[in-house]
């Protein structure tokens, strides 16, 4: 792959619009997997996705020009899947399976277009919503977050001269490579790039992916970014997200349906996918509630992704549950992905080594760690805790409780209803990083 001089490209930026999203494949792989399932089973569900800035002290509307934001969103609106991309999706092998995408779904995808957006501003923040069929509005999540993250990076870099930009990227590359050197010391570690949504920029994410490829070889298992997977001949990785149980739960009509909702999602998923895609995401309404009510067949799945519990405590709780179900944890897989930095990766690796199969989905700390890299003192390169979550399904409010109460999403009345139903056991508040 040709390696561009990122600093020079940033400094020589004279074109009218430099698109942040150049392809609908510039998204996380699990979006395509989920949308295929939604297309097949829930085609008539309408949802709203909303931008939520959890870094409340950062006034996004002051940092990012509204006209630039609209121009980038409008550009994404006009994108379509190309013939080359459709051929690749149809012919490539994903998770060891050919034709993971059904021909009818791919035919539908050929004409796919993102739905319109709704953008306003209030008190220094952007209010951004995406309404429409679940199949369509879901696909806005990753591009929207990537656009806002990169626009904020660009705004910060506009203030830097050519030499300062050189120093910035030289330091960031050295910082990244020092992490790679530490990963090399962890035998047989499995790590992948999960950093699309809050990346510094697309070019920087691509450089980080190339650095991991070069630095740790087969220990780098792939990327969640579909476009980068296609362009760099890597595995496209990803399973499923909180939006599935959030929407299914919002659509329920009684307590019995609500109790079954997290497991209905898994049954739906298993109609489409198997093997290493059978990964349980247990924390949408609290991991403890999920494990307490889980049918025995859930223990037969390949693994879990403990997303919001502290890694050591969350992993140990799932290992304990597997043992209670008569399963050998050494044959199971834990995927750690919540706000990982290099210290957390090392600590988690050493703790669970030999106890369970492990994989790490490395996100913002991989693709947007510029802290201390600028010669000029500034906080504008600090990564945001920014999410785009489903907030309504068919007009009903959606809720995410999480194992970390700081990550709870929903209106207060509905949150309390879910807490009363699922319980508050083992939910521990901790500061949100990214």
UniProtKB/Swiss-Prot annotation:
Any one biological process term the GO annotation gives: NAD biosynthetic process via the salvage pathway
Keyword Phosphoprotein listed: yes
Entry-annotated residues carrying Phosphohistidine: 242
Pathway(s) per entry: Cofactor biosynthesis; NAD(+) biosynthesis; nicotinate D-ribonucleotide from nicotinate: step 1/1
EC assignment: 6.3.4.21
Post-translational modification summary for this protein: Transiently phosphorylated on a His residue during the reaction cycle. Phosphorylation strongly increases the affinity for substrates and increases the rate of nicotinate D-ribonucleotide production. Dephosphorylation regenerates the low-affinity form of the enzyme, leading to product release.
Protein name: Nicotinate phosphoribosyltransferase
């Amino acid at each position: 792959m040709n390696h561009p001089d990122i600093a020079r490209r940033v400094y020589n930026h004279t074109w009218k619009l430099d698109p942040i999203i150049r392809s609908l494949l510039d998204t996380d792989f699990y979006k395509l997997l989920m949308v295929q399932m939604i297309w097949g089973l829930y085609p008539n569900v309408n949802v709203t996705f909303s931008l939520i800035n959890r870094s409340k002290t950062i006034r996004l509307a002051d940092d990012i020009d509204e006209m630039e934001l609209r121009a980038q969103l409008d550009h994404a609106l006009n994108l379509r899947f190309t013939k080359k991309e459709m051929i690749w999706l149809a012919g490539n092998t994903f998770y060891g399976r050919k034709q993971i995408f059904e021909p009818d779904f791919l035919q539908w995808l050929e004409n796919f277009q993102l739905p319109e957006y709704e953008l306003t501003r209030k008190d220094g923040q952007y209010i951004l919503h995406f309404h429409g069929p679940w199949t369509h509005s879901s696909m806005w999540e990753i591009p929207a977050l990537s656009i806002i993250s990169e626009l904020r990076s660009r705004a910060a870099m506009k203030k830097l001269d050519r030499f300062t930009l050189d120093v910035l990227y030289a330091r960031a590359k050295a910082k990244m490579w020092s992490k790679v050197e530490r990963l090399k010391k962890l035998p047989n570690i499995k790590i992948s790039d999960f950093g699309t949504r809050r990346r510094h920029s697309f070019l920087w994410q691509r450089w980080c992916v190339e650095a991991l490829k070069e630095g740790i070889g087969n220990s780098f298992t792939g990327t969640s970014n579909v476009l980068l997977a296609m362009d760099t001949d890597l595995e496209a990785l990803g399973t499923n997200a909180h939006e599935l149980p959030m929407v299914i739960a919002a659509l329920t009509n009684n307590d019995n349906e609500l109790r079954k909702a997290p497991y209905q999602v898994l049954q739906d998923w298993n109609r489409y996918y198997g093997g290493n895609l059978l990964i349980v995401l247990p924390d949408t309404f609290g991991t403890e509630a999920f494990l307490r009510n889980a049918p025995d067949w859930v223990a037969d799945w390949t693994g879990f992704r403990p997303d919001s519990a502290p890694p050591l405590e969350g992993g140990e709780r799932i290992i304990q549950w597997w043992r209670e179900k008569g399963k050998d944890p050494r044959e199971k897989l834990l995927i750690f992905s919540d706000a990982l930095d290099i210290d957390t990766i090392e600590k988690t690796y050493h703790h669970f080594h030999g106890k369970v199969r492990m994989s790490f989905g490395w996100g913002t700390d991989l693709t947007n760690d510029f802290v201390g890299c600028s010669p000029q003192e500034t906080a504008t390169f600090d990564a945001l805790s920014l999410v785009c979550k489903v907030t309504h399904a068919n007009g009903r409010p959606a809720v995410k409780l999480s194992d970390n109460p700081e990550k709870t999403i929903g209106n207060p009345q509905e949150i309390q209803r879910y807490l009363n139903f699922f319980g508050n056991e083992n939910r521990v508040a901790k500061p949100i990083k990214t």
